[in-house]
């Protein structure tokens, strides 16, 4: 059994009683786990598996596949502020989508976990801005090795899109909404 800090990216139904849970972890990279019995009323996972939660997880690695068994979850930070505002939730979901596109499963990248943790910490306390989204994309492009701010003035999102073949479809509507929010904030001052 192995333990690591992790942020819950996505969860979906596997069976009547179990869930498949995707995590961005500090020690193992982005992984998928099966939470057996998580959908039962008296599950030890009850209240601990929600989107964007940070937790200390214990897993048993699978020898046959990339679907590991989740054995324990200790909630560290629910990032509750993200859920207080639709735009914060939308931005966090975009960050998760972007990470899922730009990373391979089970590829250890501690910088990626640290970036997502900082981003969620920011969204937990602040409303998102175009600048915050751009910073996240720039840092992700730097981690992926496709953007060096000193050498390139190019758009880091464009570099990520070229490397991985696409960007999340949610990017354009998110940026439009953030730009509209910024204009309305500036005009009310």
Show the residue positions of the predicted features.
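Non-catalytic alpha-helical scaffolds and adjoining flexible linkers that form interface surfaces
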Residues: 1-189
């Amino acid at each position: 059994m192995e333990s690591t800090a992790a942020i819950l990216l996505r969860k979906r139904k596997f069976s009547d009683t179990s869930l498949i849970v995707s995590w961005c972890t500090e020690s193992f990279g982005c992984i998928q786990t099966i939470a057996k019995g998580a959908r039962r009323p008296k599950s030890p996972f009850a209240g601990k598996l929600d989107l964007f939660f940070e937790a200390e997880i214990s897993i048993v690695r699978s020898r046959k596949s990339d679907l590991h068994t989740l054995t324990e979850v200790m909630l560290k930070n629910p990032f509750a502020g993200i859920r207080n505002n639709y735009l914060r939730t939308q931005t966090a979901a975009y960050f998760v989508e972007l990470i899922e596109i730009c990373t391979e499963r089970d590829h250890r990248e501690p910088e990626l976990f640290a970036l997502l943790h900082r981003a969620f910490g920011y969204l937990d306390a602040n409303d998102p801005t175009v600048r915050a989204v751009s910073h996240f994309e720039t840092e992700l492009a730097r981690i992926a090795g496709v953007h060096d701010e000193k050498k390139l003035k190019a758009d880091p999102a464009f570099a990520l899109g070229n490397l991985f073949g696409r960007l999340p479809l949610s990017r354009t509507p998110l940026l439009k909404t953030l730009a509209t929010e910024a204009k309305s904030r500036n005009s009310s001052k």
